[in-house]
Amino acid sequence: MERIIVKGAPGSPYTRKMLSLLRYRRLPYNFLVGGLFDEGIMDTSHLPKAKVNLMPTIYFKNKLDNLEPMVDSTFIIRRLENLFKERSVVPKSPILKFLDYLLEDFADEWLTKATFHYRWNYEKDILKAGSTLSRWRSLTYDEEKIKPIRDNISERQISRLHVVGSNKN
Protein backbone atom coordinates (compact mmCIF):
# COMPACT_ATOMS: atom_id res chain seq x y z
CA MET A 1 0.00 0.00 0.00
CA GLU A 2 1.34 3.40 -0.98
CA ARG A 3 1.89 5.93 1.80
CA ILE A 4 -0.49 8.88 2.00
CA ILE A 5 1.20 12.29 2.09
CA VAL A 6 -0.09 14.60 4.82
CA LYS A 7 1.13 18.19 5.10
CA GLY A 8 0.08 19.97 8.27
CA ALA A 9 1.06 21.35 11.64
CA PRO A 10 1.17 19.49 14.96
CA GLY A 11 -1.03 22.07 16.71
CA SER A 12 -3.70 22.22 14.04
CA PRO A 13 -6.88 20.54 15.34
CA TYR A 14 -7.72 19.35 11.83
CA THR A 15 -4.22 17.93 11.34
CA ARG A 16 -4.55 16.06 14.65
CA LYS A 17 -7.95 14.78 13.54
CA MET A 18 -6.60 13.39 10.27
CA LEU A 19 -3.46 11.87 11.80
CA SER A 20 -5.63 10.17 14.43
CA LEU A 21 -7.92 8.83 11.75
CA LEU A 22 -5.02 7.49 9.67
CA ARG A 23 -3.49 5.81 12.73
CA TYR A 24 -6.83 4.28 13.75
CA ARG A 25 -7.40 2.97 10.24
CA ARG A 26 -3.78 1.76 10.10
CA LEU A 27 -3.18 3.58 6.84
CA PRO A 28 0.50 4.33 6.20
CA TYR A 29 1.36 8.00 5.78
CA ASN A 30 4.24 10.45 5.62
CA PHE A 31 3.73 13.58 7.70
CA LEU A 32 5.32 16.76 6.41
CA VAL A 33 5.38 19.63 8.88
CA GLY A 34 4.37 22.54 6.74
CA GLY A 35 2.07 25.46 6.42
CA LEU A 36 2.15 29.14 5.68
CA PHE A 37 5.45 29.87 7.40
CA ASP A 38 7.70 27.03 6.31
CA GLU A 39 9.96 28.74 3.76
CA GLY A 40 13.25 26.89 3.62
CA ILE A 41 12.29 24.44 6.37
CA MET A 42 10.95 21.50 4.37
CA ASP A 43 10.99 21.20 0.60
CA THR A 44 7.42 20.72 -0.54
CA SER A 45 7.93 22.36 -3.94
CA HIS A 46 7.30 19.03 -5.68
CA LEU A 47 3.76 18.95 -4.28
CA PRO A 48 0.88 20.68 -6.05
CA LYS A 49 -0.60 23.67 -4.25
CA ALA A 50 -4.14 23.45 -2.92
CA LYS A 51 -6.57 26.14 -4.10
CA VAL A 52 -6.94 27.21 -0.46
CA ASN A 53 -3.89 26.88 1.79
CA LEU A 54 -5.42 25.11 4.80
CA MET A 55 -4.16 22.41 7.13
CA PRO A 56 -3.92 19.61 6.72
CA THR A 57 -3.47 19.10 3.02
CA ILE A 58 -3.65 15.46 2.00
CA TYR A 59 -2.43 14.33 -1.40
CA PHE A 60 -4.24 11.62 -3.35
CA LYS A 61 -3.31 10.18 -6.72
CA ASN A 62 -5.81 10.96 -9.44
CA LYS A 63 -6.69 8.82 -12.49
CA LEU A 64 -3.59 10.10 -14.30
CA ASP A 65 -1.42 9.04 -11.34
CA ASN A 66 -0.68 12.67 -10.44
CA LEU A 67 -0.90 13.99 -6.89
CA GLU A 68 -3.99 16.03 -6.13
CA PRO A 69 -4.31 18.15 -2.93
CA MET A 70 -7.40 17.99 -0.74
CA VAL A 71 -8.03 20.15 2.34
CA ASP A 72 -11.50 19.59 3.84
CA SER A 73 -11.34 16.89 6.52
CA THR A 74 -14.97 15.81 6.06
CA PHE A 75 -14.44 15.12 2.37
CA ILE A 76 -11.03 13.57 3.02
CA ILE A 77 -12.69 11.08 5.39
CA ARG A 78 -15.30 10.23 2.73
CA ARG A 79 -12.61 9.73 0.12
CA LEU A 80 -10.61 7.46 2.42
CA GLU A 81 -13.80 5.47 3.06
CA ASN A 82 -14.16 4.91 -0.68
CA LEU A 83 -10.51 3.95 -1.14
CA PHE A 84 -10.04 1.71 1.92
CA LYS A 85 -12.67 -0.58 3.40
CA GLU A 86 -10.82 -1.81 6.50
CA ARG A 87 -11.54 -0.21 9.90
CA SER A 88 -14.21 2.11 8.56
CA VAL A 89 -15.12 5.12 10.70
CA VAL A 90 -18.47 5.82 9.05
CA PRO A 91 -21.37 3.76 10.44
CA LYS A 92 -23.32 1.53 8.06
CA SER A 93 -26.71 2.39 9.55
CA PRO A 94 -28.24 5.41 7.74
CA ILE A 95 -29.44 6.88 11.04
CA LEU A 96 -26.05 6.51 12.72
CA LYS A 97 -24.34 7.76 9.56
CA PHE A 98 -26.47 10.92 9.69
CA LEU A 99 -25.72 11.42 13.41
CA ASP A 100 -22.02 10.83 12.76
CA TYR A 101 -22.00 13.45 10.01
CA LEU A 102 -23.98 15.89 12.17
CA LEU A 103 -21.62 15.53 15.15
CA GLU A 104 -18.54 15.79 12.97
CA ASP A 105 -19.84 18.90 11.25
CA PHE A 106 -20.79 20.45 14.59
CA ALA A 107 -17.33 19.76 16.03
CA ASP A 108 -15.58 21.04 12.90
CA GLU A 109 -17.54 24.28 12.84
CA TRP A 110 -18.04 25.04 16.55
CA LEU A 111 -15.18 23.56 18.55
CA THR A 112 -12.65 25.43 16.42
CA LYS A 113 -14.28 28.68 17.54
CA ALA A 114 -13.33 27.90 21.15
CA THR A 115 -9.86 26.73 20.10
CA PHE A 116 -9.18 29.94 18.18
CA HIS A 117 -10.75 32.15 20.80
CA TYR A 118 -8.72 30.78 23.70
CA ARG A 119 -5.48 30.67 21.72
CA TRP A 120 -5.71 34.14 20.21
CA ASN A 121 -7.93 36.38 22.32
CA TYR A 122 -6.00 36.87 25.58
CA GLU A 123 -2.50 38.34 25.79
CA LYS A 124 -0.87 35.49 27.76
CA ASP A 125 -2.44 32.90 25.46
CA ILE A 126 -1.35 34.81 22.35
CA LEU A 127 2.26 34.84 23.56
CA LYS A 128 2.14 31.14 24.51
CA ALA A 129 0.48 30.00 21.26
CA GLY A 130 2.66 32.20 19.04
CA SER A 131 5.82 31.00 20.78
CA THR A 132 4.80 27.34 20.60
CA LEU A 133 3.65 27.39 16.98
CA SER A 134 6.72 29.28 15.77
CA ARG A 135 9.12 26.76 17.34
CA TRP A 136 7.82 23.58 15.71
CA ARG A 137 10.22 23.99 12.84
CA SER A 138 12.74 26.25 14.57
CA LEU A 139 13.65 24.70 17.92
CA THR A 140 17.18 26.09 17.92
CA TYR A 141 16.32 29.66 16.89
CA ASP A 142 17.18 32.41 19.36
CA GLU A 143 14.65 35.10 20.31
CA GLU A 144 15.86 37.49 17.59
CA LYS A 145 15.13 34.93 14.86
CA ILE A 146 11.92 33.57 16.38
CA LYS A 147 10.23 36.93 17.08
CA PRO A 148 9.31 37.78 13.44
CA ILE A 149 7.98 34.24 12.91
CA ARG A 150 5.96 34.38 16.15
CA ASP A 151 4.63 37.86 15.29
CA ASN A 152 3.69 36.78 11.76
CA ILE A 153 1.82 33.69 12.97
CA SER A 154 0.09 35.59 15.77
CA GLU A 155 -0.97 38.49 13.54
CA ARG A 156 -2.36 36.14 10.90
CA GLN A 157 -4.34 34.08 13.39
CA ILE A 158 -5.65 37.09 15.31
CA SER A 159 -6.76 38.72 12.04
CA ARG A 160 -8.81 35.59 11.32
CA LEU A 161 -10.68 35.45 14.64
CA HIS A 162 -13.77 37.01 13.07
CA VAL A 163 -13.75 34.31 10.37
CA VAL A 164 -14.39 31.59 12.96
CA GLY A 165 -16.90 33.72 14.87
CA SER A 166 -14.74 34.72 17.82
CA ASN A 167 -15.33 38.14 19.33
CA LYS A 168 -14.79 40.01 22.60
CA ASN A 169 -18.09 38.70 23.99
What are these regions (language model features)?
Residues 1-144:
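GST-like domain detector, emphasizing the conserved glutathione-binding G-site
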Residues 144-169:
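A conserved mid-domain beta-alpha-beta active-site/ligand-binding segment of alpha/beta enzyme cores
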